[in-house]
């Protein structure tokens, strides 16, 4: 009798992170669209860590006052996670942390440097 193989979970973290990113984006759109600070936030990536216990959500904001945006996201994280638990089909809902993604700013600085060469 052949041995039963374990399912390949190598991409499970990516699937969970992607699902969390999609759901949190929906939650921000549905619940905070009239919030002046959060209405300009776009989630651009997610990474799961610690056996899927933590998900880092990377965001970009049109608002130039990133510390204010980060403070506002930190303030709503608990309510977002509560809403996330209601929308996810999982026994455990990961902790979430928002981090600013400065990739666009770095890319524009590199472009400016290359133009000056």
Language-model segments: residues:
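Charge-rich, low-complexity N-terminal segments
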Residues: 1-54, 60-117
């Amino acid at each position: 009798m052949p041995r039963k193989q374990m399912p390949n979970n190598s991409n499970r973290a990516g699937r969970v992170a992607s699902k969390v990113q999609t759901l949190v984006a929906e939650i921000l759109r549905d619940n905070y669209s009239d919030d002046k600070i959060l209405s300009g936030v776009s989630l651009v990536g997610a990474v799961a860590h610690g056996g899927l216990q933590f998900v880092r959500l990377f965001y970009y904001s049109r608002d130039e006052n990133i510390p204010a945006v980060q403070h506002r996201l930190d303030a709503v994280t608990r309510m977002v996670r509560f809403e996330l638990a209601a929308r996810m089909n999982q026994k455990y809902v990961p902790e979430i942390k928002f981090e600013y993604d400065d990739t666009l700013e770095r890319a524009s600085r590199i472009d400016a440097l290359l133009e000056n060469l």
